[in-house]
């Protein structure tokens, strides 16, 4: 049995779960998330624990078992605590600011980059070189953070660009000088 899939998901008293046909809905103080289930797994809830079981031992069912267990676990965490990704901007003159609901980035190009986040995502700029992306859907938070990072990925020679908090940029040496 899948090591991840066999672990039950504890429900906090703030989170409620509804299972209808092949849909699962998790609601909590921060919002509501829905997920469509595959026919390879079944989900049940009893005594504040959610269990995910697979219908057979096929290779596909085994793969789906752990996947859906983690998706549901992330949904429960999202509606109770939420998720946040922190981005750091490094480089002379590189900065971010929030204009209305647009993230305005100055990243060394001849123009500013304006980014509109989806409605479910909240973007904060505590200072000019830090961007916080938060929301209840872990995948969407990661996707938006990756999109913002893609505007100017960190380069290996000087380390300029946008990186995740704690990300280690492998640095390279420049060209060796001639004789």
UniProtKB/Swiss-Prot annotation:
Family annotation (InterPro entries): Ribosomal_uL6-like, Ribosomal_uL6-like_a/b-dom_sf, Ribosomal_uL6_a/b-dom, Ribosomal_uL6_bac-type
GO molecular function, a single term: rRNA binding
GO terms under cellular component: cytosolic large ribosomal subunit
GO BP terms in the entry: cytoplasmic translation
Domain of life, source organism: Bacteria
Complex formation: Part of the 50S ribosomal subunit.
Entry protein name: Large ribosomal subunit protein uL6
Species per Swiss-Prot/TrEMBL record: Pelodictyon phaeoclathratiforme (strain DSM 5477 / BU-1)
Gene: rplF
């Amino acid at each position: 049995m899948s090591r991840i899939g066999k672990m039950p998901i504890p429900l906090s008293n703030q989170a409620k779960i509804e299972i209808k046909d092949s849909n699962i809905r998790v609601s909590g103080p921060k919002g509501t998330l829905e997920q469509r289930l595959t026919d390879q797994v079944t989900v049940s809830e009893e005594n504040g624990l959610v269990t995910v079981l697979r219908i057979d031992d096929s290779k596909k069912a085994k793969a789906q078992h752990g996947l859906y267990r983690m998706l549901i676990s992330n949904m429960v965490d999202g509606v109770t605590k939420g998720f946040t990704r922190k981005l750091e901007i490094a480089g002379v003159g590189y900065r971010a600011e929030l204009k209305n609901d647009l993230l305005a980035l100055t990243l060394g190009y001849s123009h500013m980059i304006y980014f509109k986040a989806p409605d479910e995502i909240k973007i904060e700029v505590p200072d000019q070189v830090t961007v916080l992306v938060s929301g209840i859907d872990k995948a969407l938070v990661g996707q938006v953070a990756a999109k913002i990072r893609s505007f100017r990925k960190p380069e290996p020679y000087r380390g300029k660009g946008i990186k995740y908090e704690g990300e280690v940029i492998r640095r390279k040496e420049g060209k060796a000088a001639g004789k």
